[in-house]
C-alpha cells in the first residue's frame, strides 16, 4: 500500500498562527511534483508545539486540500495511549488514509509495553497504521521481533517508518517481520530500498520533491546507477537539513526560497548565522536560490 516518497510536511506559521493558505500552497506544490502522499503533523510539522485544536485543524485541512489525489498519513502518536487512540480515531473520522504512530517517548516503555500500546491503537481504528521508530528522539527502540508480533496479530499494522540508522535492524525488519519499511532518514533511503524497503518519509522532499521522487523511482526500478547520481547531487542538502534540529533547517531553507514556512515555535528557535550561511551556499549550489 505504501510506496514512493511521502514528504513529512512543515506546518507554516504567520503571526504566530497556522498559515492555512501557505499550507495549501505547499501541499499543491508537492503533489504537482509527483509525491505518493503527504505526512501531516509529524516531527517536521512541529507537532509538539501545536495545540490539540491546531493539530486536528491541520489534519482536516490537509485531507480537504489533498482531496483524494494522493494518500494522507496523519500524525497521531503520543506517549499516552489514550491520547494516541483519540488522535487516531479523529484522523479516521475526517478521512485520512493512514496514521503515523510514534513509539511513546520519555516514559520509555518495554517491548511488551510497546506491543500493548500499539495493539490498543490498532484495535481502535480500521485505518492502516505506520509505526514510527526514531530512537534518537524517543529513547526507545522498537525491535523487529516486536514489529513481527504486532503485524501478525493486527492486520492494519501495515508499515514501519524506520529512522534507526542500524541497517542490520532494517534487514531483520524487512526479512523477518515481513512488513513494508519506509526510510525515516533521507540519507539512508537508497540503502534501505536496496534491502527491500519501499520508499521514504522525507524531510528533503519538502524542498526538492521532483528530484527525490526521481531518485526513489529509479531505485525501486533497480536502476541504482541513476539513483546514486541524484543521491550524491542532493547529499549536501540532506546533510544540511540536520545541521540543527529538524525542522529548523527545512523551514529556514523554504523561507530563503520564498516558499511558505514562517517562524518556528519555541523552544525551537532561529538558525545561527553560521549555519544559515552553510545552508544558503548549499541551496545556491543546487540553483534553488
UniProtKB/Swiss-Prot annotation:
Keywords: Amino-acid biosynthesis, Cytoplasm, Diaminopimelate biosynthesis, Lyase, Lysine biosynthesis, Schiff base. NCBIfam families: dapA (TIGR00674). The keyword Lyase applies. It comes from Methanocaldococcus jannaschii (strain ATCC 43067 / DSM 2661 / JAL-1 / JCM 10045 / NBRC 100440). Pfam families: DHDPS (PF00701). Its main location: cytoplasm. Pathway: Amino-acid biosynthesis; L-lysine biosynthesis via DAP pathway; (S)-tetrahydrodipicolinate from L-aspartate: step 3/4. One of its GO terms (biological process) is diaminopimelate biosynthetic process. It catalyses: L-aspartate 4-semialdehyde + pyruvate = (2S,4S)-4-hydroxy-2,3,4,5-tetrahydrodipicolinate + H2O + H(+). GO terms for cellular component: cytoplasm. It is found in: Cytoplasm. The active site is at residues 132, 161. Homotetramer; dimer of dimers. The record marks 43, 106 as: Part of a proton relay during catalysis. This is 4-hydroxy-tetrahydrodipicolinate synthase. Pyruvate binds at residues 44, 201. The keyword Membrane does not apply. It comes from the Archaea. Its EC number is 4.3.3.7. Catalyzes the condensation of (S)-aspartate-beta-semialdehyde [(S)-ASA] and pyruvate to 4-hydroxy-tetrahydrodipicolinate (HTPA).
